[in-house]
Amino acid sequence: RQFRENLYHALDGRTLDYIVVHHMEPDHTAELEDMVLRFPNVQILCTAMAKTMIGQFFGHVYDDRIRVCKEGDTLCTGRHTLQFVAAPMVHWPEVMMTYDRTDKLLLSADAFGCFGALNGHLFADEVDFDRDCLDECRRYYTNIVGKYGPQVKAVLDKAAQLDIAMLLPLHG
């Protein structure tokens, strides 16, 4: 319920045009079916594997609403140009990240995540990162994505080619 309230507040009366599915783990997709029902024209952007998983998770695939994104595909939304970055097996097999070329933001899925929150802050530079976050970032990496070392290295190589002003992980 809180998610929907936050979303409607952010939309400020506008409709939702796109849902970008970075990966299909239930903590990321619990509201997907409800959002598709509430916004009948919304387009779902995801990998081919995520499209298959949507059908497996929800019992049907919204074929008319899904746009499969591959490495390097882009979407111009008007003000923003989004570039999709494949990140398979950085935690789950269907993972992708989104790079906003306009604002230089990398929505990094579970890569670069952290356990915990920033104590009410939105940005890491508003806290003492070394004191308050570093241990939880290490613990997150070790427990969630560390076992996929070669895949994480591949994502780091891709990220190094982007002009990133801010990382926006899905956790932490």
In which residue ranges do the predicted regions lie?
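Pre-active-site segment of Zn-dependent metallo-hydrolases
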Residues: 1-19, 26, 38, 42
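Phosphate- and divalent-cation-binding pockets in alpha/beta enzyme and binding domains
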Residues: 2, 30-31, 52-56
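Active-site neighborhood of phospho(di)ester-bond hydrolases with catalytic His/Asp-centered motifs
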Residues: 16-24, 44-47, 106-109, 166-171
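Short, glycine/acidic-rich beta->alpha junctions
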Residues: 24-27, 88-90
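Metal-dependent catalytic neighborhoods of phosphoester/phosphodiester hydrolases
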Residues: 30-38
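Short acidic, glycine/serine/threonine-rich loops at helix termini
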Residues: 34, 56-59, 117-121
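Metallo-beta-lactamase
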Residues: 45-170
